[in-house]
């Protein structure tokens, strides 16, 4: 059923609503680890690859490959890492609205365990050094979908980004807090939620959000209470169990697409990219989440987080589903 619906939706993807992606482009050094290091240990890693990544860049790539045009505000610096990122973006047909910042881009070490679980250690760069001059360069059209990552919102520039968001008219923020949901100060988090964003959380992040907002940790009750408290849409991703969505109009659980997990790097980013592509095409939230599930299932079945599929690859992957 999901595969048949996906085959109906993919030809409908087209840019009907403007999208702007605000966030980071960084380098991911990915290595296999037989176990996570413990204090005082010295373990041997097997390097998989050095990939261009970052939540916002993964989403920009996913949107581009699905045929959705977006404005990409991904600060690029002047160092070695920045040049690698710039070249990779050029190959994807992407440009950044914020280029030639002073300093280099950040990077992270991703350790992948035998079961595919990943652990990140991050080093910040220009992607977390937002300022008013950069923001003044951005023209956000009315009715835009506006993506933010929790990594930037939890950084020292988070308050500046929220202040900018609060001044925008008629936009729909899409926020993937990621693991930083527990690091954003209460006052700033309240201001973010007052903007009525569409929030996407994974299982662990939903538990943290429930505790922070004094809501139920049971998914369906959480979704109902979320609507009552914030009057804003919510997506809760449950890996192989699919994804729940909640809005003022409807709620439900969209099944996951079957896949063989290789690693889960970029799973949440790619899901967000699929959802944004659906929403930008005018699809209802349920169909957008279905598209997000399909894109995420492809990405976790391949190495690295920057391997989002094209429409044709999705069609072939799920032709018998």
Sequence positions of predicted segments:
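Short acidic/glycine-enriched loop/turn segments that link adjacent beta-strands
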Residues: 103-106
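Conserved phosphate-binding/catalytic region of the ribokinase-like
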Residues: 2-19, 212-321
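Ribokinase/PfkB-type carbohydrate-kinase core domain
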Residues: 1-25, 86-100, 112-251
């Amino acid at each position: 059923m999901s595969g048949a619906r996906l085959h109906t939706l993919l030809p409908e993807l087209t840019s009907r609503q403007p999208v702007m992606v605000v966030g980071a482009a960084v380098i991911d050094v990915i290595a296999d680890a037989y176990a996570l290091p413990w204090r005082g240990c010295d373990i041997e890693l097997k390097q998989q690859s050095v990939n261009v990544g970052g939540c916002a860049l993964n989403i920009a790539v996913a949107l581009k490959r699905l045929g959705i045009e977006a404005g990409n505000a991904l600060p690029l610096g002047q160092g070695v890492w920045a040049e690698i990122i710039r070249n990779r973006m050029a190959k994807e047909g992407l440009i950044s609205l914020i280029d030639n910042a002073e300093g280099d881009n950040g990077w992270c070490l991703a350790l992948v365990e035998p079961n595919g679980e990943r652990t990140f250690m991050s080093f910040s760069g220009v992607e977390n050094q937002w300022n008013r001059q950069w923001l003044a360069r951005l023209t956000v059209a009315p009715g835009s979908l506006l993506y933010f990552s929790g990594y930037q919102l939890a950084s020292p520039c988070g308050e500046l980004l929220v202040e900018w968001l609060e001044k925008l008219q008629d936009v729909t923020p899409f926020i993937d807090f990621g693991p930083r949901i527990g690091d954003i100060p209460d006052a700033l988090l309240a201001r973010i939620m007052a903007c009525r964003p569409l929030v996407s959380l994974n299982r662990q992040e939903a538990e943290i959000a429930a505790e922070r907002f004094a809501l139920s940790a049971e998914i369906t009750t959480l979704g109902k209470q979320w609507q009552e408290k914030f009057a804003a849409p919510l997506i809760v991703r449950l890996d192989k169990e699919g994804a729940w969505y909640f809005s003022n109009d409807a709620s439900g659980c969209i099944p996951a697409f079957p896949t063989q997990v290789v690693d889960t790097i970029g799973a949440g980013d790619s899901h967000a990219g699929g959802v944004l592509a659906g929403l930008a095409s005018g699809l209802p939230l349920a169909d957008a989440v279905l598209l997000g599930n399909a894109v995420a299932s492809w990405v976790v079945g391949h190495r690295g987080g920057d391997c989002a599929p094209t429409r044709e690859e999705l069609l072939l992957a799920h032709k018998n589903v």
